[in-house]
Amino acid sequence: MERGVVESRAPQHLQKAPSKKPHDKTAEEAAEQIEGVVKIVTCFDVPQIKFPTAGHPWSTDPHHQDVADRLLLTSRVRFYGDDIAAVVAESEVAAAQALRALRVEYEEYPFVLDVQEAMKPDAPLLHEEFPNNILAHTTIRNGNYEEASREPGLIKVEGWYDTPTVQHCHIENHMCFASMEAGRIVIYSSTQIPHIVRRVVGQALGIPWGKVRVVKPYIGGGFGNKQDALYEPLCAYLSTVVGGRLVKLDCTREETFVCNRVRHAIRTHIISWVRPDGTFAARKIECFSNQGAYASHGHGIVAKGMGAFPQLYPCPNVDGDAYTVFTNRPAAGAMRGYGIPQAMFAGESHIEDVCRVLGVDSLEYRRKHMMPVGFVDGFSKNENHSDTLNQVLDKGEAWMDYSRKHREYENQTGPVRRGVGCALFWYNTAVWPISLESCSCRMVLNQDGSIQLQTGETEIGQGCDTAFAQMAADAVGIPVSDVHVVTAQDTDVTPFGTGAYASRQTYVGGFAIAQTGALLKERILKYACELTRQMPALLDIVDFGKITTYA
């Protein structure tokens, strides 16, 4: 059985329990006298260094860097899950007793939970540097929406579409361990982004990144929640203030809901000006993303979602506005699909509204008006080379027996009815062209002819290690059983990789593995040439690891 992070360190550790209360200022009352309590740290004791938490590669362009708005502990509570003090103790019981003994004095502030309310001029500001609580606003301006919408004979279809906040609910809650060894901080964490966590911890503590080592063991899921540096910086800091002893921090399920990350709730407004034949003359989209109290991944989610709007049903005249807005809710971050599920729900719901207004079958409407082969995206310049959208519609129609059920369910009455429907979904892997992509790979040839494979792209349950092993075996010419993938990542020895996100590991990591495998194969055959005195072009690795000559 694979070892989870909770089993991966010695049981001699300190417990850390963060104090969370729903208001403001703190006033510490001594609780160190409780047996087992080692240290109490408040927001007035920690370094006042703001740092970002999002799991994005570091950019040298200040305008392309994540917003640094977090402190290890804060005196300004912006949502229920903010940490204002921490107790380090020998046991969870002692830590909980100390938290109950603390007395905190608060000043209540007005709060705002709704995006539209938060954008009003008189709304309370969560961050003074962001007027109207708007973290970011981006636009799409394709063609001339205003002029195109005045074309005679157009039909206006308009709707508002809402998606809620949800939490990832991975089986394993987030946890981490931190200690000091030889003057360096060592962290074991259930994270998707070990190399990025190393950098964020260095930033938060104001120390060189090389003074931090992060190990990611086999973990129990993440789905984007663990694409943030959640509690590793605080855990590392607490270890430094107790003499480098091993400190453990793990979240309860309630804390995971409140204090980790959630999916952005997004409200979308779409207006389509449609010709009687179903073609679009002009379209407009407005997206309002509820960011919660802190930036985390911020505007990237709704910007990516809105960016997917013009492609699925091309229209020459599109206006788009996306807003990411702070509210006093839990901070929203990455979650599977990264804004695309919200965008697809809104867009496909709107297509159903269009079909209802026009009185046409929605399946046939999609076939006629969806992205064609040869379509070139104006932003990424990517071209659609395949007709797979039509293929999946055909397969879905056959599998569901869609046409028969659609006729059968047409004229139902009564409180309980059956329905059948269809929707399209498209998603692009990786983060280009917003960011550059990179991946590193190391292959070591063992004495028995097997290879050890290391990469910085993390396995979190999605199966990328299996794909990596298959790719490596194919590239070198050996059986998959002879490829040993090192599942754990250790920033001291693992090649650099940005981690698990954007459905990118197999796609991006595959290039690094293919190139590394080709290089290893070349070196193996070069050595074989020296032994056999054969020309390199006459040798190959075939039949699962056998070197053969074609002479």
Label the model's feature ranges.
Residues 60-67, 132-176, 265-349, 428-438, ...:
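Glycine-rich loop/linker segments at domain edges
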Residues 1-10, 169-174, 318-329, 437, ...:
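Flexible hinge/switch segments at interdomain interfaces of large molecular machines
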Residues 13-47, 84-106, 175-243, 300-310, ...:
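Alpha-helical support elements that line or immediately flank enzyme active sites
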Residues 1-131, 159:
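Flexible, low-hydrophobicity surface segments
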Residues 76, 168, 177, 269-273, ...:
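Short, surface-exposed charged micro-motifs
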Residues 57, 119-205, 369-450:
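Helix-loop-helix junctions that connect adjacent transmembrane helices in secondary transporters/permeases
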Residues 110-116, 360-369, 403-415, 480-484, ...:
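Flexible, glycine/charged-enriched surface loops at secondary-structure junctions
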Residues 41-82, 117-118, 123-127, 196, ...:
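Short, surface-exposed loop/turn segments at secondary-structure boundaries that line and modulate
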